Amino acid sequence: MDEQRVDIVPSPWHEGERRIQQRVGVADRMEVFGRKVIRDFLPEQHRAFYRQLPLLLVGAVDPAGDPWASVLEGQPGFIDSPDPRLLAIRARPTAGDPLANALEAGAAVGLLGIELHTRRRNRLNGTVAAADAHGYSVAVGHAFGNCPQYIQTRDYSFARDPASAAPTAIESGTSLDAAGRAAIAAADTFFIASYLDPEGERARRGVDVSHRGGKAGFVRIDGDTLTIPDFAGNLHFNTLGNLLLNPRAGLLFIDFASGDLLQLTGSTEIVFDGDEVRSFQGAERLWRFTVRAWVRRRGALALRFAFGEWSPNSLLTGSWDQASARRAAESLRSRWRPFRIARVVEESAVVRSFHLEPADGAGLPLFTAGQHLPLRIGLPGHERPLLRNYTISAAPSDDLLRISVKRDGLVSSWLHAHGAEGTAIEARAPEGDFGIDPTIKRPAVLLSAGIGITPMLTMAHRLHELGR
């Protein structure tokens, strides 16, 4: 009986979401999971959550078909849920907001409630059921929670009464100016709105708005094109699924200190693989956004936020400078390169760890958990350098090469006796097929003995990073 019901209940995912889930091998699992966690009503916990928020992220589509992301704000309590299928918002877009005329009765909207000081967030997709001079009522289509990854904590305060109109300088353009590029370059957070009209039917339109975070500077700027790494997430692919079928998107960058809002609309392209993806630590794919229009509203937000802590997930990701250095290192992959010992750590009476850094100005080579590092070391009394392989005991996200060596054998004993900070050695790019697929969710038992624990440590570290 239950199996028959699963067959007739519509999938919680649309075609674009399913296609990306299939691409990464999680479609069947996510079909079951989605039916459990995506609801057509607000659970009581979500209703209470929205009531305590001072802001709400909104995604919608303007009359020209361009999506925009924006924000509504108010004292906690400005959002209410009179019943589980309705969210009431007592706020409207402020002067100059591209969504000022888009949030009318019948309009599809995406909402994101985010509590920055706790990293909690919940999402809602629905339709504006009613609109008046004071705000909106939104009928729930889908409601679901999101994980707290990549959210930097911030504490909020109000610089003025959010209900009062503030004089706002409004600027706009079609090509990013210096101020816009500076705001984006400094950002560790932004929000993206996307939408899809299934089979071209506007009446079935669905809009999403979601959060993106990383280290400051994780958005690369090339003229009017932004490149954003896409990190491991909840595998819903709501945003990327929309972009796969409809490349239009709207971005919102908030200056948390000044209340300035920078809103962009434009088109996107998803990059699923390639050297750029592989070289950016933590990226599972990339996407590019080309600006078509922008609006900047200085001081539009009454809220101000004080930075708290970095998300641990953000700190595990790379940077564009690191990615560039890694690509340079990849071009040298088949060559012996000069390295130096940067640090020596006494792990036990018989094991020392050696931290290695490139001495040629190029970056660290890419590697996967479980691979080994070929070394070439010249020893006194030997005409030719000796070759040895040592398992890398650092995780790929550690931004270092570390080998942990037991004092046993000719080269290993020499490293213990003579390896010190500044000692020069040669290494080639990491090699080996021994490893574990961190994307597969199934129990794993790692067995090792003695110094053989080194590949297990890096595999366990990698699995922990990805929450497996």
Stretch-by-stretch model annotation:
Residues M1-Q52, R121-T227, N242-N246, S258-L261, ...:
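C-terminal edge-of-domain segments
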Residues L53-A60, A108-G113, A187-P198, A249-L251, ...:
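A short, Trp-centered hydrophobic/proline-enriched beta-strand micro-motif
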Residues A64-W68, E73-D80, P84-H134, G206, ...:
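Short, structured beta-strand-loop surface elements
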Residues A91-T94, F231-N234, T290-R292, L356-A362, ...:
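A structural micro-motif recognizing beta-strand termini
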Residues L103-A105, I184, L243, F367, ...:
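Short, well-ordered loop/turn sites that connect or cap secondary structure elements
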Residues E115-T118, A143, F256-S258, G378-H382, ...:
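Short, charged beta-turn/beta-strand-edge "cap" motif at the junction between a beta-strand
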Residues A329-A424, R428, G435, K441, ...:
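Ferredoxin-reductase
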Residues I392, I453-G467:
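Histidine-anchored nucleotide/phosphate-binding helix
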